Amino acid sequence: MFSATRHCVAALALGVCFILPAQAKNQPYGEIATQQARHIATVFPGRMTGSPAEMLSADYIRQQFADMGYQSDIRSFHSRYIYTSRNKTQNWHNVTGSTVIAAHEGRAAEQIIIMAHLDTYAPLSDADTDNNLGGLTLQGIDDNAAGLGVMLELAERMKNIPTQYGIRFVATSGEEEGKLGAENLLKRMSAEEKKNTLLVINLDNLIVGDKLYFNSGQSTPGSVRKLTRDRALAIARSHGVYAASNPGGNPNYPRGTGCCNDGEVFDKAGIPVLYVEATNWALGKKDGYQQRGKSKAFPDGTSWHNVML
């Protein structure tokens, strides 16, 4: 977990620095995040959307926020996804997911959303099951217990600090089936709430990748990119953490931008996004999918949803 802790340091420093004044440093950065990530991964494996483990983990996260003094609740949402059988028959699977929201009120009406998905991969086909992808035993430490751990540590560090803007800590579900929880969250937001959302910070896959990346949404204005992505890179360097942004080797993903997780829902809605992830945008198709160089431990250079890795 050493790399995860290092990544946590950068993510926490990012949130603290561009939102808040100087903070107390009673504990080493990443210590709380590491403990929480390990607990969530080992106690709640198989956090598939709508499963008992997902509901229990959502309640655990809600209780953690409540213990910190936050107003916190769980919002259920109904959705569905397609499952493909071995004979190529496709059927809809209905699910009820759980989204956890905790509120830190600010002096102004504007808000920043800090988000990490709590669900693990559910097999979308018989082929997925045959290949040990997802299911009841997948702990999901990289995807995405570590992201939850970072979010919980940031919430702990910020709980007694007045802020200019409100902060919403959100643990979504249904990300693995197509960003279902994020879509529901956006759908429930009023036009005024969307207007007042200055930034969405999405934490996902913080361990396995070769490098820590800070990337902006494609619709995020240049001025906001400088205040968020570029400042995050500078903060990471100041903490001795090497961080990068997408070099733009794939024309579908321009330099300095990210994609392909819950943050994308808000990016497409025109809300500024900062993606925080660990991967390697210089490998494979240069789309961020290949997380690291291929090796005996990671034959494909990825750990995506594989119970065996």
Predicted regions and their residues:
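Acidic/histidine-rich catalytic neighborhood of metal-dependent amide-processing enzymes
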Residues: T96, G135-V224
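Second-shell loop/turn segments in exported
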Residues: K25-P28, A41-M55, R86-N91, L133-N144, ...
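A non-catalytic alpha/beta surface segment that caps or lines the substrate-entry region
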Residues: H39-T42, G46-E105
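Bacterial N-terminal signal peptides that target proteins for export
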Residues: M1-V9
